[in-house]
């Protein structure tokens, strides 16, 4: 695990955190005192952790404007995060979802460790953590997380104010891909409620909204379509 966060001090800005803070104000009229961000990288490799740790500044961070930490959470560092946040949320990709920043980091990883041709194969997954300070009491961490991520392709780990006070920080694990099991086509019942249609879209990784699912539902309700399917032996 490698974490990177913008340095604090005069002239230093947390650009990603500022963007989130401004978006909450612009989109929801919610004033937040401060938002700090952390970029995370989960690296799976046969190369020794100690060797990777020596090159993190070359690969994962800009040491002039960023601090970096390996195999630990920045939120656990009293030096870097001396104030306890009101909420902390970590967002990462679900297993099997394309992680473009992770792919870019892997390209750099292969270049830096090109001397290890026998151990160069690696996988890198990325995530973002946001720490919120001065959060209005009316704003729940669950609602906040819902505005920060797309639950079709991303997952969120949340620490509310009580968890933060107890130093129970959100830590996301490497998104291991589930084993591929090929199954024959199955008949799906589309005569279901709107809630069940959304659940079907999410569980099947269809990435379709309710209107799109209802369009599919209406298509298969069409009598002409049902007759054409029956004519070629497909269950109506």
Model regions: which residues?
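Core nucleic-acid recognition elements
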Residues: 1-236
């Amino acid at each position: 695990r490698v974490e990177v966060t913008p340095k604090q001090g005069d002239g230093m800005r947390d650009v990603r955190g500022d963007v989130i803070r401004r978006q909450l104000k612009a989109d929801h009229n919610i004033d937040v005192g401060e938002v700090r961000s952390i970029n995370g990288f989960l690296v799976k490799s046969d190369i020794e952790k100690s060797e990777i740790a020596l090159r993190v500044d070359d690969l994962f961070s800009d040491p002039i404007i960023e601090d970096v930490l390996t195999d630990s959470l920045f939120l656990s560092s009293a030096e870097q995060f001396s104030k306890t946040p009101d909420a902390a949320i970590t967002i990462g990709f679900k297993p099997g979802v394309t992680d473009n920043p992770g792919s870019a980091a892997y390209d750099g990883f292969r270049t830096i460790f090109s001397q290890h041709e026998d151990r160069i194969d690696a996988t890198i997954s990325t995530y973002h953590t946001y720490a919120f300070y001065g959060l209005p009491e009316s704003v729940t961490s669950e609602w906040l997380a819902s505005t920060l991520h797309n639950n079709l392709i991303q997952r969120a780990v949340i620490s509310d104010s009580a968890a933060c006070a107890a130093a129970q920080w959100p830590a996301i694990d490497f998104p291991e891909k589930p084993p591929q099991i090929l199954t024959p086509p199955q008949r799906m019942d589309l005569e279901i409620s709107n809630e069940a249609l959304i659940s079907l879209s999410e569980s099947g990784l269809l990435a379709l909204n309710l209107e799109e699912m209802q369009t599919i539902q209406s298509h298969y309700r069409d009598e002409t379509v049902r007759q054409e399917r029956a004519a070629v032996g497909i269950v109506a």
